[in-house]
């Protein structure tokens, strides 16, 4: 879905960060990010879907599915500017807010326009669009993603007002990984997760195999997490239910019955699902990063030797450690 092209697809990258400096190796990734612009990461060709705010919500979500994208910038033709993003989180919020039962159609999803939903959703807390210039550094992009607790950052040309690209944690880490072998390896890359304390290890939001989808949606809304480990009666992870899985309800037009279990809702991908991507506290940060990038996933579930969930390590956690804190716990 969010594959990043090979290094050949990117504009030529200047390796000025390789010059000898007195800085410690622990800051090489920070220096790299500060010396490269968002423009450097934009592939020569990529798909971008834009929605007008007058579009029906339902049509917009179907369009996300059809185009294989997870989010789209919103264009307000009255204001002649981009005003926000429509994401799978919006789909989850609408379903959770308006679902009554399998027998009652969700009128708001079927009939509302995007602008109507935004008026309802943002009435208590107007949030201006968080975006970035193509000339801003990747360090600024990572800082903005983490500071604003967002997963998508539109790159908007300040002169034309056009959206050029959508930056994500995954794309930034993949870009860094393309050049990572050229750096002297920082000391913290050889340290374990346990030593570095990267990730979340308290109050992990989880669901059981029998948990209804509607309850899972409520946990997404309340905890603002992007995935929920699915555990058995002994707390062992057997699956994972992510926000991206929820959009399948639109693909299959099954969003009118949210009383089914998450296990049943996940059956659609059983033929290609390779299992939950896991890691252990004793594994090094380097191993974790390689696994995340190669598997193209957004997080790993930290487990013990019995597969009991101990924590979650997300791309956001990794980028914060690599770029903002130099391997130190923030």
From Swiss-Prot:
Residues the record lists as binding AMP 1: 85-90, 130, 151-152
Residue ranges of the motif AMPK pseudosubstrate: 138-159
Modified residues (Phosphothreonine): 263
InterPro entries in the cross-refs: AMPK_gamma/SDS23_families (IPR050511), CBS_dom (IPR000644), CBS_dom_sf (IPR046342)
Coiled coil: none
Family: Belongs to the 5'-AMP-activated protein kinase gamma subunit family.
Biological-process GO terms, alphabetical: cellular response to glucose starvation; fatty acid biosynthetic process; positive regulation of gluconeogenesis; regulation of carbon utilization; regulation of glycolytic process
Keyword Cell wall biogenesis/degradation recorded: no
Sites where the protein binds ATP 2: 70, 152, 170, 242-245, 269, 277, 298-299
Domain notes: The AMPK pseudosubstrate motif resembles the sequence around sites phosphorylated on target proteins of AMPK, except the presence of a non-phosphorylatable residue in place of Ser. In the absence of AMP this pseudosubstrate sequence may bind to the active site groove on the alpha subunit (PRKAA1 or PRKAA2), preventing phosphorylation by the upstream activating kinase STK11/LKB1.
Self-association and partners: AMPK is a heterotrimer of an alpha catalytic subunit (PRKAA1 or PRKAA2), a beta (PRKAB1 or PRKAB2) and a gamma non-catalytic subunits (PRKAG1, PRKAG2 or PRKAG3). Interacts with FNIP1 and FNIP2.
Protein's job: AMP/ATP-binding subunit of AMP-activated protein kinase (AMPK), an energy sensor protein kinase that plays a key role in regulating cellular energy metabolism. In response to reduction of intracellular ATP levels, AMPK activates energy-producing pathways and inhibits energy-consuming processes: inhibits protein, carbohydrate and lipid biosynthesis, as well as cell growth and proliferation. AMPK acts via direct phosphorylation of metabolic enzymes, and by longer-term effects via phosphorylation of transcription regulators.
Entries under CDD domains matching the protein: CBS_euAMPK_gamma-like_repeat1 (cd04618), CBS_euAMPK_gamma-like_repeat2 (cd04641)
The CBS domain, residue ranges: 43-103, 125-187, 198-260, 272-329
Region of interest: Disordered: 1-24
Binding-site residues, ADP 1: 85-90, 130, 151-152
Modified residues (Phosphoserine): 261, 270
Residues annotated for AMP 2 binding in this entry: 70, 170, 242-245, 269, 277, 298-299
Pfam families: CBS (PF00571)
Name of this chain's protein: 5'-AMP-activated protein kinase subunit gamma-1
């Amino acid at each position: 879905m969010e594959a990043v092209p090979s290094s050949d697809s990117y504009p030529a990258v200047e390796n000025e960060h390789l010059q000898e400096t007195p800085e410690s190796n622990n800051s090489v990734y920070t220096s790299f990010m500060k010396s490269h612009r968002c423009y450097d990461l934009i592939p020569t060709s990529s798909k971008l879907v834009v929605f007008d705010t007058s579009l029906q919500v339902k049509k917009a979500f179907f369009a996300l599915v059809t185009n294989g994208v997870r989010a789209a910038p919103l264009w307000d033709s009255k204001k002649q500017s981009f005003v926000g993003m429509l994401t799978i989180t919006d789909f989850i919020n609408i379903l959770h807010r308006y679902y009554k039962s399998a027998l009652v159609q969700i009128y708001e999803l079927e009939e509302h326009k995007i602008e109507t939903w935004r008026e309802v959703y943002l009435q208590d807390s107007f949030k201006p669009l968080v975006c970035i210039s193509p000339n801003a550094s990747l360090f600024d992009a990572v800082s903005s993603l983490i500071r604003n607790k967002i997963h998508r950052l539109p790159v908007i040309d300040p002169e034309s007002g056009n959206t050029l690209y959508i930056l994500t944690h995954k794309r930034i880490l993949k870009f860094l990984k393309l050049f990572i072998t050229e750096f002297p390896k920082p000391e913290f890359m050889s340290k374990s997760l346990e030593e570095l304390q990267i990730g979340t290890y308290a109050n992990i939001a989880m669901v059981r195999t029998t948990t209804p989808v509607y309850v899972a949606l409520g946990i997404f809304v309340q905890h603002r997490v992007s995935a929920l480990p699915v555990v058995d009666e002994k707390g062992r992870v057997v699956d994972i239910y992510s926000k991206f899985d929820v959009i399948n309800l639109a693909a299959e037009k099954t969003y009118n019955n949210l009383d089914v279990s998450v296990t049943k809702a996940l059956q659609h991908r059983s033929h290609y699902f390779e299992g939950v991507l896991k890691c252990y506290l004793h594994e090094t940060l380097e191993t974790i990063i390689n696994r995340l990038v190669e598997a193209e996933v957004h997080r790993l579930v930290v487990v013990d030797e019995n597969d009991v969930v101990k924590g979650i390590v997300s791309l956001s956690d990794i980028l914060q450690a690599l770029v903002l804190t130099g391997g130190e716990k923030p």
